[in-house]
Amino acid sequence: MAGRSGVNDEDLLKAVKIIKILYQSNPYPDSSQGTRQARRNRRRRWRARQRQIRAISERILGAYLGGPQEPVDLPLPPLGRLTLDHKEDSGDPGTESQQGTATTE
């Protein structure tokens, strides 16, 4: 497929087929049988399995597509410019300047 280097199309299709089988193996639970609590528990277990399938799918794609094993370094500003002073935060513009600017004429 265009735009990727070093990835075989057959490997990618194989990964997609594996992921498709994983998702098909966990259909949404039947909501017409059982008590409300039983249906709720089935949905809760289904969501937990979906989270597991999603995590496995990410690992499969990562193995087939590769990618950086370590997080990408983000450019940070110089440490001298970083402060924890709340006065320099720009949360609501104009709120601090209004507190002490009462003029009497």
UniProtKB/Swiss-Prot annotation:
Single GO cellular component term: host cell cytoplasm
Which stretches are tagged as biased composition: Basic residues? 37-49
The UniProt annotation puts the region (Homomultimerization) at 18-26
Where does the UniProt annotation locate this protein? Host nucleus, Host nucleolus; Host cytoplasm
- What ranges does the record give for the region Disordered, renumbered to this chain? 24-49, 65-105
Q: Locations of Polar residues compositional bias?
A: 24-35, 95-105
Q: Keywords for this entry?
A: AIDS, Host cytoplasm, Host nucleus, Host-virus interaction, Methylation, mRNA transport, Phosphoprotein, RNA-binding, Transport
Q: Which residues carry this modification: Phosphoserine?
A: 5
- Coiled coil (UniProt feature): none
Question: Where does the motif Nuclear export signal and binding to XPO1 lie?
Answer: 74-85
Record family assignment = Belongs to the HIV-1 REV protein family.
**Further information:** HIV-1 lineages are divided in three main groups, M (for Major), O (for Outlier), and N (for New, or Non-M, Non-O). The vast majority of strains found worldwide belong to the group M. Group O seems to be endemic to and largely confined to Cameroon and neighboring countries in West Central Africa, where these viruses represent a small minority of HIV-1 strains. The group N is represented by a limited number of isolates from Cameroonian persons. The group M is further subdivided in 9 clades or subtypes (A to D, F to H, J and K).
Name by which UniProt lists this protein: Protein Rev
This chain's source organism reads Human immunodeficiency virus type 1 group N (isolate YBF106) (HIV-1)
Phylogenetic lineage:
Viruses, Riboviria, Pararnavirae, Artverviricota, Revtraviricetes
Q: Which gene encodes it?
A: rev
